[in-house]
Amino acid sequence: MKKEAVMSWLRSHEQEQIEFLQQMIRIPSVTGNEGPIQEFMAKTLTEMGLAVDLFVPSLEELQKHPAYVAPAQPYEGRPDVVGTLKGAGGGRSLLFNGHIDVIPEGSLDNWQHDPWSADIADGKMYGRGTSDMKSGAAAMTMAIRAIQACGIRLKGDLIVEYVMDEELTGNGTLACVMKGYKADAGICCETSSMCVQPGSIGRIWFTINVKGKAAGIQKHREGVSGIDLGYLVCKAVEEYEALRMSKISHPLYPDILSSIPCAIGQFDSGT
């Protein structure tokens, strides 16, 4: 009966869920600017009666962990938000995790709707982060609201993590781990096809530096072009990816060629 009650509430409050997601989309949160959306999430959880922990990850502490990835931007003003719905006791705990940062919106010429408008057209919501992954973060929040509205008291604690800096490093989640947040089970609420995704490819960032030899335009053939060398590196990385895909696979994803990707994400040259 409890499950049916929750599902019934969610169906009858669909518009409320849509409007909540629109509120989230309309607060830009490109990686590096997570502060405003996190203040909104902390306020929302506080109003719902959860115990809320709003904290800025410590780079000094993160650097001590082997899973730490060097940040591209400072962390000041970029907090994590963790909410806890305390259980009655005697039950297992559950943790929901979702990131709140989004990738840059890019050129507005590529958008049919303003990326921060959350416009709805033809049954779809348009905006940066609707899929990746403010919809998942909104679902986490609305699940708790549904439980509360139905008067359900869980036995175990329900913890919800809204983390920063997922798009670049994943250090937001690492900071929650290092602060001691854990549960008997956890679900990352990234959007999916409603199928359990039990594995992740992980991430390694690396930098390749090549050194050329400067020369004026009149004598450029006497120099060494760093750009030409860079092209060779790009080709080598492409061949390396093909080699990896031919030799490495994951038992959970045997038919996905891109399960072991390797690619150049940024190319800089010149002085």
Model-derived segments and spans:
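Short Gly/Pro-enriched turn/cap motifs at secondary-structure boundaries
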Residues: 70-76, 196-200, 253-256
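Acidic/histidine-rich catalytic neighborhood of metal-dependent amide-processing enzymes
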Residues: 125, 131-205
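Acidic/His- and Gly-rich active-site-bordering loop/insert found
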Residues: 2-125, 154
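Short, solvent-exposed loop/turn segments at the edges of secondary structure
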Residues: 78, 113, 201-205, 257
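The feature captures the short pre-catalytic strand/loop hairpin that immediately precedes
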Residues: 119, 207-213
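Short glycine/serine- and small hydrophobic-enriched flexible loop segments
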Residues: 23, 142-149, 232-238
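Acidic-enriched catalytic cores of C-N bond-cleaving enzymes acting on peptides and small amides
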Residues: 199, 217-267
